[in-house]
Design a protein with these regions (language model features):
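The serine-hydrolase catalytic nucleophile loop
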Residues: 35-47
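Conserved alpha/beta-hydrolase
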Residues: 47-69
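Catalytic nucleophile-loop/oxyanion-hole region of alpha/beta-hydrolase
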Residues: 65-91
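Primarily recognizes the serine-hydrolase "nucleophile elbow" in alpha/beta-hydrolase
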Residues: 90, 95-133
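Active-site loop signature of alpha/beta-hydrolase-fold enzymes
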Residues: 36-37, 63-68, 130
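Short beta-strand element of the alpha/beta-hydrolase
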Residues: 25-33
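N-terminal cap/lid segment of alpha/beta-hydrolase-fold proteins
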Residues: 1-23
Length: 133
């Protein structure tokens, strides 16, 4: 059975996180797509592959997604990116990270590259970034 934890973020807000094999030096961070969560086929497949290879796995549900706090309608790329940044700082600051992002998750993963030097790899699945800024 998969055990999730909730990490307190800001005042009375919690982000749902799945964290496996905490002793690993390398972590796959899965970032799901818009209106998705961590119960789908992609995160479950990746988690199994990580376990098989003794690599850490982490996924999170951004605000308004899955069982995390908030309403989807109030979320923005910035707020969801900040959710990801906060959790990486809490859990993986001294670990090597490979980000695998699906759709919106790929966009959020690309944004993290400017914040973390310990990201050693990136895979975008159906990436949907917007480069107008």
């Amino acid at each position: 059975m998969t055990k999730f934890e909730f990490i307190k973020y800001k005042t009375n807000k919690k982000i749902r996180v799945l964290f496996k094999n905490p002793k690993s030096d390398i972590f796959v961070v899965f970032l799901h797509g818009l209106k998705s969560d961590l119960t789908g086929k992609k995160p479950n497949y990746l988690m199994k592959q990580c376990k098989k290879r003794k690599v850490g796995f982490m996924g999170l549900e951004y605000s308004g997604h899955g069982k995390s706090y908030g309403k989807f309608e109030t979320g923005t790329i910035t707020s969801w990116s900040n959710d990801v940044k906060f959790i990486i700082k809490q859990k993986l600051i001294n670990k090597k990270i490979i980000i695998i992002g699906s759709s919106l998750g790929a966009w959020l993963g690309l944004i993290q590259l400017k914040y973390f030097k310990n990201i050693i790899g990136f895979i975008g699945i159906g990436a949907a970034p917007e480069f107008l800024d």
